[in-house]
A protein has these predicted regions:
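Outer-membrane beta-barrel translocator domains and adjoining extracellular loop/strand segments
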Residues: 47-53, 88-95, 144-153, 204-209
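Transmembrane beta-strand segments that form the barrel wall of outer-membrane beta-barrel proteins
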Residues: 37-47, 198-200, 204-205
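Glycine- and aromatic-enriched membrane insertion/assembly motifs of diderm outer-membrane
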Residues: 34-36, 42-45, 51-104, 110-112, ...
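Outer-membrane beta-barrel "beta-signal"
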Residues: 189, 212-224
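Membrane-embedded beta-strands of outer-membrane beta-barrel proteins
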Residues: 37, 60-62, 80, 114-118, ...
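Outer-membrane beta-barrel transmembrane domain signature
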Residues: 68-74, 104-191, 195-203, 224
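Outer-membrane beta-barrel biogenesis signature
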Residues: 5-8, 16-33
Length: 224
């Protein structure tokens, strides 16, 4: 117990010391709110019965961060993200209602996403800060298209990813949520981040099926 208390005290002391550092033009000692923009890419996939491998997409976002306490370099960040999601080489669930044998489906859809992440600032040097983060995200798909091609031919057909009448098993649910974790690095207001998003809600509409959307992501941007 004594060692645990000492470790906790050391952690709080180190947190207080981090509060004085500055990363480039961003000073934790002076600024409690920051704004930023992000641009990057995702490698998204669908798991479960959807079973679709990685599909590369684009991300655009505007973010805002708040430091709730002057004593610790902890930030709460949110924003609005536009992200391309989906997967390719999907199983029979993600195709059309009448899926030919040997067909390949490429699922694509675009989402608006609102994350709510907690970041902790770690000083690397006077110019560089590292910020691990985690938190939930909430998303809603605004559009989507699924393209199905029969292997060995040029024959293909497209359908709306969320089309209950034409998409296999009623298509996908538009709303979803999950967990987001990763690490960011800031240098002179330039910000880089890498991470992974785990879908925790079932996006398959039919009750007897399950599926989740997951994605690796890499973004670059600036914090102002």
């Amino acid at each position: 117990m004594k060692k645990v208390l000492v470790a906790i005290m050391a952690m709080f002391c180190s947190m207080s010391s981090f509060a004085q550092y500055s990363s480039g033009g961003f000073s934790l000692d002076e600024e409690n709110i920051y704004w930023g923009v992000r641009f990057g890419m995702t490698a998204a996939s669908l798991s479960g019965d959807l079973d679709a491998s990685s599909k590369v997409g684009m991300t655009l976002a505007g973010v805002v961060g708040l430091r709730p306490s002057d004593n610790t370099p902890v930030f709460i960040e949110s924003g609005l993200y536009y992200t391309e999601r989906g997967g390719k080489n999907g199983g029979p669930y993600v195709g059309l209602k009448r899926t030919p044998d040997g067909s390949v489906s490429r699922v694509g859809y675009n989402i608006l996403e609102i994350p709510l992440t907690i970041k902790y600032g770690l000083k690397v040097s006077d110019q560089i800060a590292v910020l691990p983060f985690f938190g939930p995200y909430f998303s809603y798909a605004i559009s989507g298209k699924t393209k199905q091609t029969v292997k060995g031919t040029t024959e293909s057909e497209s359908v709306g990813t969320f089309d209950e009448k034409k998409a296999c098993h009623g298509g996908l649910n538009r709303a979803s949520m999950g967990l987001k974790l990763g690490v960011g690095a800031e240098y002179n207001k330039i910000y880089l981040e890498l991470g992974y998003q785990f879908g925790i809600t079932n996006i398959a509409k039919e009750e007897n099926f399950s599926g989740r959307s997951n994605a690796f992501f890499a973004n670059i941007g600036v914090n102002l």
